[in-house]
Amino acid sequence: SGSCEVKTCWMQTPHFKEVGDRLLVKYQNAKRVVARNSIGGGLGLANVPKKKRKRAPPPPEDQLVFLEDSPNFCNPDGEIGIFGTKDRYCNRTSDGADRCDTMCCGRGYNIKLERRTEWCYCQF
């Protein structure tokens, strides 16, 4: 009487929130790099004084990097088609991108209360 044991291993993606949390940490720790126009190309770390510049080691494979700062979406910039957030409607109770604390970029916001009377065609 022989017995057989089977072991199966697999990889599974984490929950979506965990992926988002990890990406946020990487985004917050991203490093600016400059593209080199030399033989072999490559990327080097930015903001290094010219006198101290040496060939910087390449960023780690799992390091999030960027070439230029993101535009400021709070203020209008017609050159790149950003309208800004001034005079836009926001949602005080939202947890999303339309939340007033986020959308208004710390400038504060006005609360507008409206009272409407509408016909509801109700039947009693």
From Swiss-Prot:
GO terms for biological process: canonical Wnt signaling pathway; cell fate commitment; neuron differentiation. It comes from the Eukaryota. Disulfide bonds join 90-105. GO terms for molecular function: cytokine activity; frizzled binding. Keywords: Developmental protein, Disulfide bond, Extracellular matrix, Glycoprotein, Lipoprotein, Secreted, Wnt signaling pathway. A lipid is attached at residue 1 (O-palmitoleoyl serine). SMART domains: WNT1. The keyword Disulfide bond applies. Glycans are attached at residue 91. One of its GO terms (cellular component) is extracellular space. Residues 40-61 are annotated as: Disordered. InterPro entries: Wnt (IPR005817), Wnt_C (IPR043158). Coiled coil: none annotated. Palmitoleoylation is required for efficient binding to frizzled receptors. Depalmitoleoylation leads to Wnt signaling pathway inhibition. It is found in: Secreted, Extracellular space, Extracellular matrix; Secreted. Ligand for members of the frizzled family of seven transmembrane receptors. Functions in the canonical Wnt signaling pathway that results in activation of transcription factors of the TCF/LEF family. Required for normal embryonic development. Belongs to the Wnt family. This is Protein Wnt-3.
